[in-house]
């Protein structure tokens, strides 16, 4: 027996008689694996033989009990030198295996633990009855059983199962006989009951029919059993089992209907021990109705069988019974008026840290009867808008705050400096070693110092101090100091006095002096000794300011850089001497480089203006007290993100002081300076700091628990003492003390979500900094930070006594809430910028263009429409929005680009007249370009003016122009015309940056900001976090649990960004802080634009937001115009050749078989996708109006599939008559006879998917009105299926652009293909594209096969789209040339007759910068070698090799020397 093993046996008090057995003779511990995060220890033992079963059980039980006392889980396995396979020992251990997880599941244990085992032919044989599922045993249980028996010491085992015929017959016989006995008894009981009943009944003439089986009674009994059944925790289910009952919450639901019409609901539940997948089939309508109770958030009791799902291969419950149950939520049980106010709560806008939404925080506080609740996210206020709206709705006061990162503006190098010559001074360079970082809870164990003059050590001080208790392993490992060093050490007070004498008349010096000085002063104070008053130099800050270019300024890195000896880092005497040597290097450099000679100069002349970047961050909570404070808060957030950002947003103290009006300050958490001072400097220092604040925060002891693990506080009693000290600080500083919860999630069981999110940050994050070193290092546990009720908080602080606890938890928090005024976070009105004479300009431009097109006087229909729109636009202050959009479009037009409109702006005729959109929303009409005569078709018989037959003006004979899409103005600004206009514009991607700068130019840079966005953790990303957490922390979750955890961890703020085209314009008579703070996107301080801090959607009804989006269509049109010289405005919308594309391929000169599709839609915007091409094939559109229908149908949700598609297939409706775009509903219903207001309301309900969500009474009212006006039932039913609809104006703008592109495909094909490949194609494979039709078709077939097998990559999918167009181009007789080193462009394809020459960027792996460099280099001279191409052209060796393989380089030699050699010989 080894000494180590013997010591372990002593610790667990293993009985001596068992230790003396022969198996223990050579016992040893082979290895111990310590899993620090899970606190699991794995022992691997060696024994001479397999232990007797009684000895094994004793060893097992004593190990478990002993380590449980230290909160450590233990497992162990055994390697036995000799193995005894005797039947008795085998049978005993076989049965023992079923007492250990995972073999101890109820079903496995009951079925297999009693079976007989023997050892034959080097195999363990299990005899089982023949009806046992051997396959199930082998697949699901055998591996676990083998593993457990091997852990007992039986070595590598082979196990087999045989059928025991005798057992089978015996069990079968017993089963049959017992069943017969039961049946016989049931029959006998029934006969006796019948006889008794007959004796009681009067005689009857007719025979009574035989009693029927009472199914209802059976169901009732089953239900009663279900109600009383034992609930099984989900975590315990590991194998297939029957009649299991769960209780839990539904978190995912999916309904399906099979092809045969059967209904199934798949759902997932959690009981917070684990989660499970469940499914239920509906056998009849009653079962189907039960599906309605299975919804997200509902708590259910379910019973069913656990089976392995053949598709997912995971355990799934097939539900037999289900019942909704009441889940008892936590409640705040304190009486009204005696409830606390939570003043420190983080929402999911605290980056990668908190889980609860601001809505759930406010709703819960309101539900609990709290009068107010505060929001204090980390360094941001992005939850303010939602919190503001939710609080108003919930009838509770929201207190708006944040937890800020406060730093000192300038961190001094010297404390208490005096006028002294640095080079004539005497220095005491000292260092202390301690048992931890807390001066109040940890002890000094060494003080060492070197007294130095002019760089020489003149005297040294080195004393150990016995703390009165053994040192922890961590302290010994860190410092190298052991208990032996401390034996015989002097008392602390003696050492302190001696050190004070040693330091007289000297400047004190330390590395990170704030710690050492703070520790010394706390100990001086504790022993009534004077604190340090002489000057102190901090060499850490000295180095940071003197050598800002260095990344690390710790003692270790600095001594290495300056070659100063440091043999035993973290022993005070060595550290002190090394610090002293560094000091004189610093003094010399400071004198020579900066002229620093006097101690006073260190702070005045050397401390950098941006030293705040390196300053230690301290947390503080800042609260908005009134409206002035809100604006100051916005300014502080902005400054911290824009001017003072360094790793995190920082607020220098002087900046906070300058903006403190209307704000209240709290001391925050354990990272606040007051809490830190209590720990490290003492109560007196903490009181001085506390005077800066408005109140002192204390938190539940559970929140401070990680400080115990980090050895900053000794134990629970130490935490309670710190809280008492904080209360004492408040008393002395005359500041109220408030108990806050530091909330990060709502419910206790949600702790795991935060754990997953925080641990995903990795060890680089401060919150994950490890405790200990090596394999045993682990991050500190996270505190229990759920939202606590008043009762729970009072329980947390019960150690203070009832009265004091009530004061800090309830009274003081309520008093603070009463000091907070209601503020307006989000404005109630729209504030547009001011443009001089905007109203007059919009009206003037509108009438000017209208007169030009329609004549003066205007037709009544035009005049009335303009008057209606201008009344709304000018009356609601929207003119500036229209004018700004017009100015931007006009500027882009002047640069040669068309601008496409998006959304519903095309519903506004004023927008059309002033040039914002090309879409004309008037009813279809003719208008003469010569005499302005017009004809309008207002009966709804024509869907689009472009579909009117060509016609000449009856007055002057000039061919009419055709226009009008029949779109009501109400779809843009609402029925009353007061909805804030959202004008979205598609600029060319090439011109988008210029358009953005136009906004700055028009409104001023200080008023234009990019629209900010907040990026949150997506569920797929959260899934990855969960899997990573499993891997890193030794967890295993079943699939349903992974899904739950991923859903729970999703939605947390991860980063910020900017809308791709959104720009917010602040009115020039206000400033941005009236609406939102500002910041840089994704904390990129080099970004050229600042963004709104708030998500732009939160303020889009208060300020002007311009959507200046980049789009390929305008770029494509510009390219085609440049190639052809054709003005796209002149392209007709009813070109016959273009319309022919939608019905066949003949117009392209190819057959459908050649290009693989029956129409010519490939590469046409809006219509080129597989989905829309399929729609075209089914509907065969022939008019512009029908194309609008297709556009609407393809962009809507539940508009085509399962709706219009079926109506058209069944001949009930046509493409023309189905509901396609949202506006069609209003127009159709008005033509049918409904009042405009009702028609508008119906349209709004349908387009937003609300038709089935409104009250039945409201919906029936609409249906009755429609039926009264002969609206067909199919139309009404179609309305009920729609979830989302596309605006007709948007469709019209897109279709118009698409037809212009299609025009070039038909009439100028080589130009079309050149533009397509230059602008739209996403992937290229030049070798294939230049290889001819066979190569292209073969590659397409290859990708098609991969697609069928789900093996195609995203790049291959993009390439397939490109190859479809290449194939079409080649089939039409055009050619695809090879890349040419001297002719190819960098970026764009070029036309050479009937051939396209690809650009360099089309070569896989060659980027835009290299492409441009090659073109530039070739202009400077021919490439004489591959080496020169690499050097001057910037091409990598791989790219040059690829070019060579493709024949692009010809016979180019490897280097120039070979060329010279060839020239001479």
Swiss-Prot record:
Molecular function via GO: 3'-5' exonuclease activity; DNA binding; DNA-directed DNA polymerase activity
One Pfam assignment: DNA_pol3_a_NII
Top EC class, one word: transferase
GO biological process, one term: DNA-templated DNA replication
Catalysed reactions, semicolon-separated: DNA(n) + a 2'-deoxyribonucleoside 5'-triphosphate = DNA(n+1) + diphosphate
Cellular compartment(s): Cytoplasm
Chief localisation class: cytoplasm
Keyword match Transferase: yes
Domain Exonuclease: from-to ranges: 427-583
A GO term from the CC aspect: cytoplasm
Coiled coil: none
Keywords: Cytoplasm, DNA replication, DNA-directed DNA polymerase, Exonuclease, Hydrolase, Nuclease, Nucleotidyltransferase, Transferase
InterPro entries: DNA_pol3_alpha_NTPase_dom, DNA_pol3_finger, DNA_PolC-like_N_II, DNA_PolC-type_N_I, DnaE2/DnaE/PolC, DNAPol_HHH, DnaQ, Exonuclease_RNaseT/DNA_pol3
Enzyme Commission no: 2.7.7.7
Family statement: Belongs to the DNA polymerase type-C family. PolC subfamily.
Main function: Required for replicative DNA synthesis. This DNA polymerase also exhibits 3' to 5' exonuclease activity.
Protein name: DNA polymerase III polC-type
């Amino acid at each position: 027996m080894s000494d180590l093993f013997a010591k372990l046996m002593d610790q667990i008090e293993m009985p001596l008689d068992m230790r003396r057995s022969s198996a223990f003779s050579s016992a040893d511990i082979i290895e111990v694996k310590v899993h620090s995060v899970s606190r699991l220890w794995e022992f691997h033992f060696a024994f001479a033989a397999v232990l007797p079963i009684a000895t094994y059980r004793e060893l097992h039980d004593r190990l478990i009990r002993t380590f449980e006392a230290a909160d450590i889980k233990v497992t162990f396995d055994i390697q036995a030198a000799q193995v005894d396979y005797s039947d008795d020992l085998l049978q005993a251990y076989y049965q023992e295996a079923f007492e250990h997880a995972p073999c101890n599941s109820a079903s496995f244990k009951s079925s297999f633990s009693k079976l007989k085992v023997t050892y034959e032919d080097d195999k363990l044989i299990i005899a089982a009855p023949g009806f046992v599922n051997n396959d199930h045993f082998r697949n699901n249980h055998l591996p676990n059983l083998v593993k457990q028996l091997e852990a007992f010491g039986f070595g590598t085992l082979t196990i087999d199962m045989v059928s025991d015929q005798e057992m089978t017959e015996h069990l079968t016989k017993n089963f049959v006989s017992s069943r017969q006995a039961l049946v016989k008894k049931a029959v006998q009981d029934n006969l006796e009951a019948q006889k008794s009943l007959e004796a009681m009944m009067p005689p009857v003439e007719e025979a009574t029919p035989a009693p029927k089986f009472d199914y209802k009674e059976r169901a009732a009994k089953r239900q009663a059993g279900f109600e009383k059944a034992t609930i099984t925790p989900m975590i315990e289910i590991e194998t297939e089992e029957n009649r299991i009952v769960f209780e839990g919450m539904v978190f995912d639901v999916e309904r399906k209907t099979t092809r045969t019409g059967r209904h199934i609901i798949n759902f997932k539940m959690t009981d917070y021990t684990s989660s499970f997948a469940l499914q239920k089939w509906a056998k009849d309508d009653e079962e189907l109705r039960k599906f309605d109770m299975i919804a997200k958030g509902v708590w259910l009791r379910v019973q069913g069988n656990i089976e392995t799902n053949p598709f997912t291969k995971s355990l799934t419950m097939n539900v037999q019974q289900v019942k909704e149950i009441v889940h008892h939520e936590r409640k705040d049980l304190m009486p009204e008026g005696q409830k606390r106010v939570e003043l420190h709560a983080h929402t999911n806008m605290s980056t990668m840290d908190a889980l609860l939404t601001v809505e759930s925080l406010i709703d819960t506080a309101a539900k609990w009867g709290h009068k107010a609740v505060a929001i204090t996210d980390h360094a941001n206020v992005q939850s303010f808008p939602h919190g503001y709206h939710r609080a108003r709705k919930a009838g509770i006061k929201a207190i708006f705050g944040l937890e800020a990162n406060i730093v000192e503006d300038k961190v001094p190098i010297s404390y208490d400096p005096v006028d002294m010559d640095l080079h004539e001074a005497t220095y005491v360079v000292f260092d202390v070693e301690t048992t931890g970082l807390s001066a109040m809870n940890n002890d000094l164990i060494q003080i060492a110092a070197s007294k130095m003059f002019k760089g020489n050590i003149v005297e040294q001080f080195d004393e150990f101090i016995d703390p009165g208790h053994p040192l922890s392993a961590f302290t010994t490992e860190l410092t190298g100091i052991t208990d032996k060093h401390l034996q015989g050490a002097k008392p602390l007070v003696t050492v302190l006095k001696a050190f004070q004498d040693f330091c007289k008349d000297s400047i004190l010096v330390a590395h990170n002096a704030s710690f050492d000085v703070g520790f010394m002063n706390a100990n001086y104070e504790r022993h009534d000794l004077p604190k340090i008053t002489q000057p102190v130099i901090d060499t850490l800050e000295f180095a940071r300011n003197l050598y800002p270019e260095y990344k690390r300024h710790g003692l270790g890195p600095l001594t290495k850089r300056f070659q100063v000896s440091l043999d035993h880092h973290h022993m005070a005497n060595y550290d002190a001497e090394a610090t002293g040597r560094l000091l004189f290097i610093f003094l010399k450099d400071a004198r020579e480089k900066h002229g620093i000679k006097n101690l006073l100069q260190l702070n005045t002349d050397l401390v950098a203006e941006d030293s705040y970047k390196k300053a230690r961050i301290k947390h503080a909570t800042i609260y908005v007290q009134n409206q002035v404070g809100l604006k100051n808060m916005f300014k502080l957030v902005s400054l911290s993100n824009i001017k003072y950002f360094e790793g995190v947003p920082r607020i220098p103290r002087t900046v906070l002081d300058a903006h403190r009006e209307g704000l209240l300050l709290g001391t925050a958490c354990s990272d606040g300076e007051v809490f830190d001072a209590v720990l490290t400097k003492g109560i007196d220092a903490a009181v001085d700091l506390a005077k800066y604040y408005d109140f002192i925060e204390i938190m539940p002891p559970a929140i401070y628990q990680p400080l115990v693990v980090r050895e900053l506080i000794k134990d629970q009693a130490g935490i309670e003492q710190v809280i008492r000290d904080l209360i004492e600080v408040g008393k002395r500083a005359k500041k109220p003390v408030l108990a806050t919860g530091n909330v990060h999630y709502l419910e206790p069981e949600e702790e795991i979500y935060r754990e997953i999110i925080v641990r995903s940050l990795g060890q680089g994050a401060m919150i994950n900094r490890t405790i200990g070193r090596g394999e045993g290092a682990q991050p500190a546990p996270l505190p229990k930070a759920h939202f606590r009720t008043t009762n729970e908080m009072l329980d947390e602080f019960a150690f203070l006594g009832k009265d004091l606890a009530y004061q800090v938890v309830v009274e003081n928090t309520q008093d603070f809430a009463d000091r907070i005024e209601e503020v307006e976070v989000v404005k109630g009105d729209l504030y547009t910028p001011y443009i001089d004479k905007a109203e007059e300009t919009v009206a003037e431009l509108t009438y000017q263009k209208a007169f030009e097109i329609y004549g003066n006087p205007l037709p009544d229909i035009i005049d009335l429409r303009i008057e209606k729109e201008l009344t709304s636009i000018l009356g609601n202050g929207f003119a500036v929005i229209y004018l700004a959009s017009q100015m931007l479009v006009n500027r882009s037009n002047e640069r040669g680009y068309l601008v496409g409109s998006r959304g519903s702006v095309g519903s506004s005729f004023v927008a059309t007249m002033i040039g914002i959109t090309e879409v004309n929303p008037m009813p279809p009409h003719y208008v003469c370009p010569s005499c302005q005569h017009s004809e309008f078709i207002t009966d709804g018989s024509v869907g689009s003016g472009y579909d009117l037959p060509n016609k000449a003006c009856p007055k002057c004979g000039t061919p009419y122009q055709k226009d009008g899409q029949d779109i009501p103005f109400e779809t843009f600004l609402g029925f009353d015309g007061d909805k804030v206009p959202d004008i979205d514009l598609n600029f060319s991607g090439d011109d988008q940056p210029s358009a953005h700068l136009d906004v700055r130019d028009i409104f001023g840079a200080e008023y234009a900001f990019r629209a900010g966005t907040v990026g949150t953790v997506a569920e797929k990303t959260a899934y990855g976090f969960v899997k990573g957490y499993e891997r890193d922390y030794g967890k295993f979750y079943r699939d349903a649990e992974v899904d739950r955890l991923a859903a729970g961890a999703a939605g947390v703020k991860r980063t910020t960004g900017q809308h791709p085209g959104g720009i917010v314009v602040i009115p020039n008579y206000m400033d941005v802080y009236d609406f939102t703070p500002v910041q840089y996107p994704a904390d990129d301080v080099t970004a050229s634009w600042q963004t709104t801090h708030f998500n732009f959607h939160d303020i889009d009804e208060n300020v002007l937001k311009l959507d200046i989006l980049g789009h390929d269509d305008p770029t494509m049109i510009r390219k085609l115009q440049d190639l052809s010289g054709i003005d796209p405005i002149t392209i007709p919308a009813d070109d016959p050749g273009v319309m022919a594309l939608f019905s066949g391929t003949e117009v392209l000169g190819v057959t459908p078989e050649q290009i693989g599709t029956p129409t010519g839609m490939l590469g046409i915007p809006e219509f080129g996708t597989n989905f829309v091409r399929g729609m075209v094939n089914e509907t065969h559109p022939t008019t512009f109006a029908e194309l609008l229908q297709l556009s609407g149908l393809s962009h809507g949700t539940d508009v085509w599939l399962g709706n219009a598609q079926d109506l058209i297939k069944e001949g009930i409706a046509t493409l023309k008559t189905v509901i396609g775009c949202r506006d069609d509903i209003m127009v159709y219903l008005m033509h049918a006879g409904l009042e405009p207001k009702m028609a508008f309301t119906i349209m709004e309900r349908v387009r937003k998917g609300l038709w089935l969500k409104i009250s039945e009474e409201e919906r029936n009212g609409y249906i009755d009105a429609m039926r009264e006006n002969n609206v067909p039932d199919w139309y009404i039913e179609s309305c009920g299926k729609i979830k989302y609809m596309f605006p007709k104006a948007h469709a019209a703008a897109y279709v118009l652009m698409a037809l212009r592109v299609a025009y070039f495909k038909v009439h100028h094909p080589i130009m079309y293909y050149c533009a397509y490949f230059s602008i739209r194609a996403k992937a290229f494979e030049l070798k294939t594209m230049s290889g001819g039709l066979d190569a292209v078709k073969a590659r397409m077939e290859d990708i098609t096969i991969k697609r069928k097998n789900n093996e195609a990559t995203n790049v291959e999918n993009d390439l397939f789209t490109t190859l479809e167009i290449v194939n079409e181009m080649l089939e039409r007789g055009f050619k695809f040339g090879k890349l040419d080193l001297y002719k190819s462009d960098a970026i764009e394809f070029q036309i050479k007759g009937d051939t396209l020459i690809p650009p360099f960027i089309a070569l896989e792996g060659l980027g835009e910068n290299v492409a441009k460099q090659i073109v530039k280099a070739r202009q400077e001279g021919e490439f004489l070698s591959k080496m020169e191409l690499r050097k001057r052209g910037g091409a990598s060796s791989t790219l040059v090799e690829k070019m060579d393989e493709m024949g692009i380089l010809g016979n180019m030699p490897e280097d120039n020397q070979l060329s010279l050699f060839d020239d001479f010989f």
